[in-house]
C-alpha cells in the first residue's frame, strides 16, 4: 500500500468508513422519517460525498486517510437510507427497493471499471467526486413526493428486536464479505503481481453478477403487508 504500512492499518481505515456510515445511516435515516424530506438529505449527501471522496486525493498518510474515510462514511450515510425510502415511496411497488439496491451494485461496477481504466490510485478519487456531482445534478430532477412524518419513539429498537435473527444473519454475512474483499486486492497485488485494472476485473465479475441476480430476485418478491415493510417489521 502507498499509504498504510500494514494490513492492520488497512483494516482500521476500512472499518472507520463502515463505523461512521452505520452511525450516520441510523441517525439521518430516522431524521428523514421525522422531517419527511427525503430529497433534502439525498442532495446534501451527494454534495458532501463529492467533497469528502475528492479529499482522498490529498491523503498521503494513514491519519489523513482515516479522516477522509470517516468523512466519506458520514456523507454517504446521510443519503443512503432516505434514497431507499424515496425509491419505495415513489415506486409504490414491492420490488422497487430491491431494484434500487441492484443498481447500487451496478454503480459499484461502473466505479470499478472507471478505477481500472484510470489505473491510478489517486486519480480515481477525482473521478469518484465527479460521479457524485453528476448524481447531485440528476437528483435535482427527481419529483417531490408526499411523505408522512414518522415520529413514533423507539421505532429503531422495535425494528431491531423484531428482526434480530435477520439482522444477525446479515451482520455475519457482511463480516465475512468485508474481510474477504478487504484482503483480496492486497493478495492479488502483492502475491500475484496484479495491476489495478486486473483487480478491477475481479470486482466487476462480482458486482455484475450481483446486479443480474438482484434484478432477477426482485421480480419474485412477494410482500403481504406493505405498511409493515415500510417501517421495517
Which residues does each PLM region occupy?
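Structural signature of the two symmetry-related core transmembrane helices
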Residues: 40-54, 227-233
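Short amphipathic helix-loop junctions that connect adjacent transmembrane helices
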Residues: 1-9, 182-198
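Symmetry-related core transmembrane helices of the 12-TM Major Facilitator Superfamily/SLC fold
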Residues: 124-140
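Residue-level signature of mid-helix packing/kink "hotspots" within the transmembrane helices
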Residues: 18-26, 108-109, 207-215
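Cytoplasmic helix-loop-helix junction between adjacent transmembrane helices
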Residues: 68-104
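Helix-to-loop junctions at the C-terminal end of transmembrane segments
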Residues: 24-36, 212-226
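Helix-breaking motifs and short loop linkers at transmembrane-helix boundaries and internal kinks
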Residues: 36, 58-60, 193
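Juxtamembrane intracellular "pre-TM" segments in multi-pass secondary transporters
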Residues: 142-172
Amino acid at each position: 500500500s502507498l499509504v498504510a504500512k500494514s494490513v492492520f492499518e488497512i483494516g482500521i481505515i476500512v472499518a472507520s468508513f463502515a463505523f461512521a456510515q452505520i452511525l450516520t445511516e441510523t441517525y439521518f435515516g430516522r431524521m428523514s422519517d421525522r422531517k419527511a424530506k427525503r430529497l433534502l438529505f439525498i442532495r446534501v449527501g451527494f454534495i458532501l460525498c463529492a467533497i469528502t471522496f475528492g479529499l482522498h486525493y490529498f491523503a498521503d498518510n494513514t491519519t489523513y486517510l482515516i479522516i477522509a474515510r470517516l468523512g466519506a462514511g458520514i456523507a454517504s450515510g446521510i443519503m443512503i437510507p432516505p434514497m431507499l425510502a424515496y425509491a419505495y415511496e415513489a415506486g409504490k411497488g414491492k420490488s422497487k427497493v430491491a431494484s434500487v439496491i441492484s443498481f447500487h451494485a451496478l454503480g459499484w461496477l461502473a466505479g470499478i471499471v472507471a478505477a481500472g481504466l484510470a489505473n491510478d490510485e489517486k486519480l480515481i478519487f477525482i473521478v469518484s467526486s465527479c460521479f457524485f456531482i453528476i448524481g447531485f445534478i440528476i437528483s435535482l430532477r427527481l419529483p417531490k413526493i408526499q411523505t408522512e412524518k414518522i415520529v413514533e419513539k423507539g421505532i429503531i429498537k422495535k425494528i431491531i428486536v423484531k428482526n434480530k435473527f435477520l439482522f444477525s444473519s446479515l451482520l455475519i454475512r457482511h463480516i465475512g464479505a468485508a474481510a474477504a474483499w478487504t484482503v483480496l486486492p492486497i493478495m492479488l497485488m502483492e502475491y500475484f503481481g496484479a495491476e489495478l485494472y486486473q483487480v478491477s476485473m475481479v470486482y466487476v465479475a462480482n458486482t455484475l453478477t450481483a446486479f443480474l441476480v438482484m434484478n432477477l430476485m426482485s421480480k419474485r418478491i412477494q410482500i403481504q403487508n406493505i405498511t409493515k415493510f415500510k417501517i421495517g417489521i
